């Protein structure tokens, strides 16, 4: 974490303890392909300093190798972990924001411990959540539990997309993990979308000069 890191406990309410507070984050909101994935994690206070020393921070600031090294460490020391997924069909039906909230609720529901509060990355509260919650802007940079959740979500989703790369060759999914790189966009224009591409997102690819009708 950075020198400006705030302790998660800065966001605790009365009665909250480390062992009852869950950090929650998502990955894949801006992708053209695949589900949005979320993770929730509860850490013991004794794990905070070791995880900070190990380099746990926002997953986007870490290399793939660093994330893969930290993933088993987080799982080992965590009191509880949970993952949630919202499918492409759910993203298409509800929109990406509501699908992300759905995935977050699913991840939190898989935590097998009492929960007194959820620390949510971002500035929007999760609707229909039955626990008290606090949103933290750039929480994955400031809160160790949210940072840990960001790593768990990122590694889990990356592994899923790498498996799907074998099912849908030609799109280089294993390289860009479904994000809208130039290579990915060009592959879609050449090959057309797969069943796991987000049609709402792909509409932005349509240009008058393109001779290929994707839809």
UniProtKB/Swiss-Prot annotation:
Catalytic activity entry: Endonucleolytic cleavage to 5'-phosphomonoester
Entry binding sites for a divalent metal cation: 25-26, 121
Subcellular location: Cytoplasm
Cofactor note: Manganese or magnesium. Binds 1 divalent metal ion per monomer in the absence of substrate. May bind a second metal ion after substrate binding.
S-S pairs: none
Similarity comment: Belongs to the RNase HII family.
Name of the protein in question: Ribonuclease HII
Organism: Synechococcus elongatus (strain ATCC 33912 / PCC 7942 / FACHB-805)
The gene coding this protein: rnhB
